[in-house]
């Protein structure tokens, strides 16, 4: 509790006053923490429930609130009470007591109170409504307290202390008032609601009581609560914390809800969730249905109608004699019709050519995997190139120099140049689009495919293990079907079977041949499902994965969270995505407990391979066993190993999603930059071909280019180096722990020009990529299992036998922890120091790298504790090396207290 507010003077006009006592000293002269009034009345507040308050005012409205110098604090319930109770003594007669029950805080603060009977009849609190509470004083006065405040303050703030006094300044616009409406017995009065609370902080507010003399019959008293700026500062601090929160940390939870009721819409036996995005609907393995289906829009319909009309007109022009003689600008009519046909319907015809090329590409497996994506990606640009090429050819061969001589127009050459400019612009844009798509696809495949494949397999394992045992149910179903077939054969052969056997083989309500499709272990991909089966995912590699499938996998990782499956929710038709998503490490731990209870046998402390095979196929179960620490060596999975794996899987999935998002943003920005450069090149081409740029203009432009190169040359160089560093070198991803200049940093965000890191104390450090280009970067995440070093010293007089025993016992301990350390750790006598210290070194190798630095130090600390234990058991202690002291002369002893036998003149 903050007592600084209690020591402030009360210069406000709102003070504690009694209507009948005008000679009461001002609060400025009241002693602090002292018994001022020997006989006075007080108020009793007893909070027996989180939302209830009891108070009693002695002598009605003439009861001032006072404080005393006796304060007691404690953390535990050691005072003989069952509730958190702390006391503050205000006076001997009229004390004030506050008791808190069920408070979440470890400590408490109360006011010690005396004996004052309290009568109360509180009304029930209703959310969103004012709370009316009534108390009776000594003179049978009835006091009504109306409380109405924000609901969010009720659950997070503490009980107000009546010792708080008014601050030096008040904000009248934001003050909160609590009205005490007093009536005598026999009267009736209904108090109006006022904004206050039964539970709010007193450290940031102060309260005073004043008398409202406008209504003498009601004699209403008010407690005015003035909120200080500290509450607003705290809110702003919370907002700033949210803004500066790391993306690698769990988001804040506003409500603590139990993590239960997990469910998944469909167990796909590896069919991963589908992603519906408007720019890339993918319903087939390699080619989307959008490209397989023909579109018929308004423009296409007009092109078809124009094609039919122009072909009909062309046929009439070639067959009708009178039309053959018609000339326009000394050109036959059919030439104009051919030109209109190419100009209006050329794009439609070029689309037919693209479809023919795609048809032959689809017949070839390798071309379909590697080339088809890029063909569809640039199909519009290719279609425009073919169309403009046809238009240019038709214009060149139909409108020859004879037409120019006849028309004597200087505009026709410009038309030719404009068509050439359009064609070159389209070809240049086509090359740009193709290069960007090829580079982006190859970058994503080479960099993220392995991590995406591993993350999706982890998601499949989590969903499968949290659901019902599919494989076991399928096996039981097959056994039941075989038993039923045998019974059918025996019945057809005329054998008499006991009715119990038939009833057991054919239970009522079950045919034995139909299985719940939601529980089916293998579900084929339907035409409407965009999922990817695990069999298909396992067959993918860097060489055979298509660009479309890679794009699908990236969308799944970016947009789909880790989910669990609850067998009880399979039959539910109501889908709430938030109830089955793992969005924090806390939920990941809860999901691990749920999965362990679902997979383990009754009463077992570990999960074995046989338990996994109830949910997964044998090859998948073997692969899953290798994911948990210690499982390959011990052939079992512990609770801690399952929890650690699921938490690490959640962290990896979150970091991978952030990496893909940052990479997508960087690629889009790079694409925009290339678009700007391409547009500038196209403008220059137009100026040159149309001969708009004369020699003077070119000279002026070149001078400006030189000036811009001098100003922005270093910037262009920096941008180019940053792009090469990010997409070619690519030394890290989001979430990787790196070491730069001997400082360990975690990658927070990647951009084209900069990278944001988090230091060990969560300090954000921003490095320019051009500067990182020149530094050595150590990446812990991409490192293999890393070693460690532990050194300790013993005295030189330590026997070699003990040193051998130390080595043997440490080696045995490391070998007995195969889930943490590799066996046969190196233990050597490293050095001899000052002829009396022998330095020993232990060089073990972890089963992990140092990406999780906390886990690394935890395992190392356990090993150091074991070394200390071994040294203590072998009585290896620290000793000072004995020193030889040579005394050459000694002064004569002149003393009456000389031991017998000593001579005063004995030489030294």
Swiss-Prot record:
GO CC annotations on file: endomembrane system; plasma membrane
Compartments where located: Cell membrane; Endomembrane system
Coiled-coil residues: none
Gene3D superfamilies with a match to the protein in the record: 2.30.30.60
Keyword Transmembrane: yes
Composition bias, Polar residues: 1-25, 75-85, 156-171, 207-218
Record GO biological process: monoatomic ion transmembrane transport
InterPro entries in alphabetical order: LSM_dom_sf, MscS-like_plants/fungi, MscS_beta-dom_sf, MscS_channel_2nd
Bilayer topology: Multi-pass membrane protein
Protein keywords: Cell membrane, Ion channel, Ion transport, Membrane, Transmembrane, Transmembrane helix, Transport
Ways its activity is controlled: Not regulated by MgCl(2), ruthenium red or tetramethylammonium-Cl.
Chain intervals with Low complexity compositional bias: 196-206
Disulfide bridge map: none
Annotated region (Disordered), positions in chain: 1-88, 148-172, 190-221, 242-265
Protein family (similarity comment): Belongs to the MscS (TC 1.A.23) family.
Function text: Mechanosensitive channel that opens in response to stretch forces in the membrane lipid bilayer. Exhibits a 6.3-fold preference for chloride over sodium. Regulates osmotic forces during pollen hydration and germination.
Record protein name field: Mechanosensitive ion channel protein 8
